[in-house]
Every structure is written in C-alpha cells, then in structure tokens.
Amino acid sequence: MAEPFSTILGTDGSGGRCKYLNKGIVGLGSYGEAYVAESVEDGSLCVAKVMDLSKMSQRDKRYAQSEIKCLANCNHPNIIRYIEDHEENDRLLIVMEFADSGNLDEQIKLRGSGDARYFQEHEALFLFLQLCLALDYIHSHKMLHRDIKSANVLLTSTGLVKLGDFGFSHQYEDTVSGVVASTFCGTPYYLAPELWNNKRYNKKADVWSLGVLLYEIMGMKKPFSASNLKGLMSKVLAGTYAPLPDSFSSEFKRVVDGILVADPNDRPSVREIFQIPYINKGLKLFVQALKKNERISDSVKEVLVTQVSEILSSEVSPDAHRFLVSQINYDVTHRGHVNKLGGGNGKSWKPRFLQIVRGQLILTDDEEGNNPKGLNLEQVQGACPVPHSTAKRDFVFALNTVGGKGMWFQAVSHGDMEMWVHAIQRGIGVA
C-alpha cells in the first residue's frame, strides 16, 4: 500500500509528483506530527499537520474535523490561514499557513531566561490588541477558540501575530464532564473558573484565557501556578496573583484585573474590552503603526483598519446583550420539524417535531403533539453544528446533556440549523 498523501506531501526526490516538499518536522502531538513544507508550484512555505485517525476516539475525530471547519471558515490576518485538507488510509492531513518566527511561548521563555527582558508596553499592547481582533472575529462568527495559550500564538517577521490550533484538545468538554486530571497532558493554566466548577461555558471562557495570556506577556510568567491541580484550582477560584512589573502603566495593569474576574457574568466580552479607554486609545495607535509598516501588504492593512474603524465607531453599553451564564432563559421559544437520529444497533433518522418552550425541550412524533418526551434545559450542556464529513448529512446539529449523552438532529436548512443551535444556546444562557 502506498504511503498516505504520497501525491501531496513528498521529499526533495519526489520531483513534480507531489504538491508540497517536506522540509522537516516542527512539532509533535498526541496523534501525529507537524512539518514545514514547501509548495512545489511557487516555493512558498506552509505547515502540513498529519494525524493518525486510527489512534483517535470518535470524540477526538470530531475535534479534528472541528479544527478543519473552524480554520476553513476563518479569513482574518491574525488567524492562521487554512489551505487544504485530505484524508487517506486513516490519516488526516491539514495544510495551513506558516508563521516564520516561532511562537509566543518560546519568545517568553527566551526573554525570561536569566535577567528577564520584559516586553515594552507598546509591544505587549500591540500583541494583545491583535489577539483581541482575532478573538472578536471568531466570536462574531459564532465560534469559540477553546485553546488560547502562548504556544498557540504564532509570530511573524512582519510584526503580525496569528492565532492557531482551534480547540483540538479535549480541554473544555472533558473538563465540563469532570475528568480534568485524566485528560490534560499538562497543567491547565488557562482554564476559566466556570470550567473548574463544571459549569456551562461560553465565549467568556475564551476571554479569561486571553487575560491569563496578557498577564503572561507582561509578567513573563503565568498568573496562577501550583504543584498540583487541586492547588491550581484553588488559586484560580480565589483569583489571587502576584502584582505585575512596575514598568507597565497602572492603566494597562488594570486591564488584566478587569479581565481576570471569576464570575463570567461580570467578565467583559471582547467588544467591552475594546471600550476600555486605554485599549480604545491603543487601537488608534495600533492603526497608525500598522499603516507605516512596509512589511505588511496593503490588502492586510485594509482588513485590519476596516475592523478597527468599525470597532471604534460602535458603542457597547455595559448592559448590552447581557445574559447570565448558566441561568435558564424561560423566554426563549423555538419550534419546527427535524429528523432525529435513533439509538441502538439499527440507527435511523426519523421525522419529529421539536420545540423549546418554558425552559423545556419537547420532542413529539408530529406537530399535533403525539408521544411527547421532555427534557429540562437545566440538563442541557450545549448545542453545536456537526460537520457533514462526520454526520454524512447536511444541516445536522448535536445536543449534549450534562450527563454526557448526545442527541443528533437534522434541520431543514443551514439557516434553520443555525437558528436551532442559537436558540438552545440562548435558552441555557451561553449565547
């Protein structure tokens, strides 16, 4: 049997028989490797990530497909660009943009060795602002990143930073299921308090991780550390951390304090962070510096300037779109025809009528209400789209319960599927 991807990823001796030449390994993961690759067509560099699907559980495979979907749906200068993906012989290949200056974790460790060489305030601010712009784009497109950490912040020689690796780890869903210790290969420094407490999470969990990362950029160390998970959890829930260096302004340090708030209902959204006067002023300075940067293309400048201009012209009141995380919203209603995937050995899709009303999901055989089955929204963990490559059907969404049970439904259209997911998320207080 031929090696997987032999016509796509080859070595220097492959000649014109492949699209990319493998130039060497740059990373190792639980299920495979990442390589620097060179395009045979134009000589440009990219990253080829190869994963062994045979070693993955069904959940891990869903995470891999989710990463592909998230990357493919993103088009932003501060997010690693998706190029293509292929699957052969139980192997998955994802080709994506190459960042030529390593990652932020490496940079922090390098600066922190010996006498710490702190970032200058404008350097730290511009790093943070670019990550905020990336996260604003992700959240505005109804996605979560779920794995924000310094190792996933990639650096380039142009000065642009790029967010990569969308939530391929087990981090959030497994933590909610209460299996933190057996899941993490490392200590979950960036995990939000609501996840340690096994509560529902939403985009505010990404914001917490962003706050931890900002502290790390400014302080050259993580705000919370301990010798074991129990100790780390205690520190995170207490919200105590060492003061940041005096080389940073009090206004900048207050941004960290404002983000690392234990209650997600009191934690700002990214849009609310942009309204902080210090950050708002920083955005204007960032645009000025961006326009003068000759290493960045005009097309990229235009995208970022347009986004910042929209942010600066918008107003977000503190109570706008406010909701309580984990509080059931009894005012949410939605109803319509769906197909439901049955359980057992003979799984099949059956037409059903689904509705959300008075804090309950009610499933019946038909619109007349025959054979009703109810589920309190208190028992619902979340809802999300299922990729076609996984469901083998269009417009499928999954509903996950607090007890770990999953149910799949097929909507009548893509728009209908999005409405169902959003309605369920609003009903359980996470959207």
UniProtKB/Swiss-Prot annotation:
Residues binding ATP, per UniProt: V26, G27, L28, G29, S30, Y31, G32, E33, A34, K49
PH domain boundaries: 331-429
Keyword Membrane: no
Catalysis performed (reactions): L-seryl-[protein] + ATP = O-phospho-L-seryl-[protein] + ADP + H(+); L-threonyl-[protein] + ATP = O-phospho-L-threonyl-[protein] + ADP + H(+)
Active site location: D147 (proton acceptor)
Top-level class of the enzyme under EC nomenclature: transferase
Domain Protein kinase: residue ranges: 20-279
Keyword Protein transport part of the UniProt annotation: no
Protein name: Putative serine/threonine-protein kinase A
Protein's gene: NRKA
